């Protein structure tokens, strides 16, 4: 007769054998890609289904109008925004995405490609956990599950179309490749990051600070300088030239000064106010919302939050 104790032992042994198989190099390579594929399918189906009931935000409409204008050979000036779509965030990654819409239906293409960007982030996240943080399969699985079920991830998938989503896997992959000293590959991923949104140059600069803290001073300084330079050139030269002559988000920085260069001078002359804005209550609550589901995991180190801090001001 099988007792409860015997059944429990059999269950434990079966679980241990399963975990041992997952710890094998082959399973470690395949598992994150399988998870990413499943997550992509789920997110894509949810986003497309949401679009059918007209439940998506206006951001999708902005980019669909821009696509139509670009196909017609006209400047993509979105009527509701009153400016060129690229003047908003200098999201030049939208150009190659637009090429796909010439082959596939525009709405579904934008949503499916966005879902892919969200899902594929699982792979570098897994690799960071396994290689950089030396976590076991169980801990990495918990991180992956926390990411997949995170409210911010689900809301982003169902909130229209946002080119900056493509920066998420690229930023994680850039950090991972930096740990392996593959700097040309890092450069490719960072190009994806900054072409997704101009102010993500600040996130690249913060990633450079992370590299500096990890004894990669020379490369870290270079990455930080490139990220900061990209943001400044895009925000104060390219975006005003494409748009209405000034940085389109100046109202958010009105407390620092008037005009693009007035804001820049105000931020440089009073860095403590900038730091205060980054760590004010609302920004701090954003950080807690982002990391709360994974605070118990050993992967989390406070310096890894630095790439997102510039975006909270």
Q: Could you describe each region identified by the protein language model?
A:
Residues 62-70, 82-106:
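Short hydrophobic/aromatic helix or loop-helix immediately within or flanking a transmembrane segment
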Residues 92-113, 272-283:
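Juxtamembrane segments of multi-pass membrane glycosylation machinery
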Residues 108-133, 173:
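Transmembrane-helix motifs of polytopic, lipid-linked glycan transferases
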Residues 13-14, 202-229:
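Perimembrane helix-loop-helix junctions
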Residues 113-117, 142-173, 192-204:
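Multi-pass, polyprenyl lipid-linked donor-dependent membrane glycosyltransferases
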Residues 59, 217-309:
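Membrane-lumen/periplasm interface segments of specific transmembrane helices
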Residues 1-46, 130, 137-140, 216-223:
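Start-transfer (signal-anchor) and selected internal transmembrane alpha helices
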Residues 133, 166, 171-185, 211-215:
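Membrane-interface transmembrane helices that cradle and orient dolichyl/undecaprenyl
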């Amino acid at each position: 007769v099988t007792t409860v104790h015997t059944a429990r032992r059999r269950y434990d042994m079966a679980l241990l054998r399963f975990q041992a198989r997952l710890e094998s190099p082959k399973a470690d390579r395949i598992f994150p890609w399988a998870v990413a594929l499943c997550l992509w399918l789920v997110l894509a189906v949810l986003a497309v289904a949401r679009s059918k009931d007209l439940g998506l935000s206006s951001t999708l409409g902005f980019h669909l109008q821009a696509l139509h204008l670009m196909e017609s050979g006209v400047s993509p000036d979105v009527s509701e925004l009153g400016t060129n779509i690229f003047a908003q965030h200098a999201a030049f990654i939208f150009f190659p995405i637009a090429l796909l819409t010439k082959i596939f239906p525009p709405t579904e293409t934008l949503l499916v490609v966005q879902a892919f960007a969200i899902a594929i982030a699982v792979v570098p996240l897994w690799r960071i956990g396994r290689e950089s943080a030396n976590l076991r399969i169980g801990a990495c699985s918990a991180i992956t599950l926390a990411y997949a079920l995170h409210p911010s991830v689900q809301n982003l998938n169902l909130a229209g179309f946002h080119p900056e989503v493509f920066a998420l896997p690229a930023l994680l992959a850039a950090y991972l490749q930096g740990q392996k000293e593959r700097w040309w590959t890092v450069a490719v991923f960072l190009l994806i990051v900054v072409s997704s949104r101009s102010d993500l140059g600040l996130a690249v600069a913060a990633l450079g600070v992370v590299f500096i803290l990890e004894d990669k001073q020379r490369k870290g300084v270079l990455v930080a300088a490139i990220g900061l330079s990209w943001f400044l050139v895009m925000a104060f030269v390219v975006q005003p030239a494409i748009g209405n002559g000034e940085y389109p988000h100046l109202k958010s920085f009105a407390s620092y000064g008037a005009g693009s260069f007035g804001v820049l001078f105000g931020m440089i002359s009073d860095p403590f106010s900038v730091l205060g804005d980054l760590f004010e209550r609302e920004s701090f609550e954003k950080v807690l919302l982002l990391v709360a589901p994974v605070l118990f995991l050993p992967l989390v180190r406070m310096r890894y939050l630095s790439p997102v801090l510039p975006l909270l001001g």
